């Protein structure tokens, strides 16, 4: 309603409206003041999203919590773009890896994933894209398929599909940036690109 108080606490790399500790405290203060707080989180609250920290902090202060579940962008965005993360005879598993660890470095799991036949989904990795590609170039062929999807499923979605050797140029050509997910693996080669679906949600295709 119009009487609802809305407080923006969003985060982008290097630009935080509030620190995580401040967000935790704000949840408690507002719950004690109003009796009811909705913490609306973008992205994936329980996949690199620190959602459990907020719940723990609230419950430590005697505030009951409830979770409204959603679909992870790591699964939903590839699916909406016709990309299966597993496929018989092609990929038996998939990895979901953060592009930015708590010490702001690329996860060491990327090197392990690059040596696997699994599909790899990297979240928050655009600012380390060249480092990721360099690791893969040490372990995989240049024709390894890669998809990068910015603002997945939204009307301003951008998507490029290329290979290990071409994806960097495509990203620059179409000016992709964060927030985006990086999908690496042979299942990308078999993507079913549903143009009708993309048009129905207002996506202008560029790939």
PLM region spans:
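Class I SAM-dependent methyltransferase SAM-binding "motif I" and its flanking Rossmann-like core
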Residues: 42-116, 158-161
């Amino acid at each position: 309603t119009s009487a609802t108080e809305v407080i923006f606490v969003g985060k982008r790399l290097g630009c935080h409206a509030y620190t995580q500790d401040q967000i935790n405290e704000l949840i408690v203060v507002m719950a004690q003041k109003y009796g009811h707080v909705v913490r609306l989180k973008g992205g994936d609250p329980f996949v690199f999203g620190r959602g459990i920290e907020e719940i723990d902090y609230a419950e430590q202060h005697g505030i009951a919590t409830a979770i409204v579940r959603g679909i992870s962008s790591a699964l939903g965005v590839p699916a909406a773009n016709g990309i299966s993360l597993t496929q018989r005879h092609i990929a038996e598993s998939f990895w979901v890896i953060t592009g930015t660890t708590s010490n702001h470095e690329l996860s060491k799991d990327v090197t392990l994933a690059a040596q696997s036949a699994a599909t790899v989904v990297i979240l928050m990795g655009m600012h380390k894209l060249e480092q990721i590609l360099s690791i893969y170039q040490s372990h995989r062929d240049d024709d390894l398929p890669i998809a990068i999807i910015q603002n997945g499923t939204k009307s301003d979605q951008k998507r490029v599909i290329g290979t290990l050797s071409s994806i960097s140029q495509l990203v620059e050509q179409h000016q992709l940036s964060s927030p985006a997910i990086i999908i690496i693996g042979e299942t990308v080669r078999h993507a079913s690109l549903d143009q009708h679906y993309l048009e129905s949600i207002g996506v202008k295709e560029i790939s």
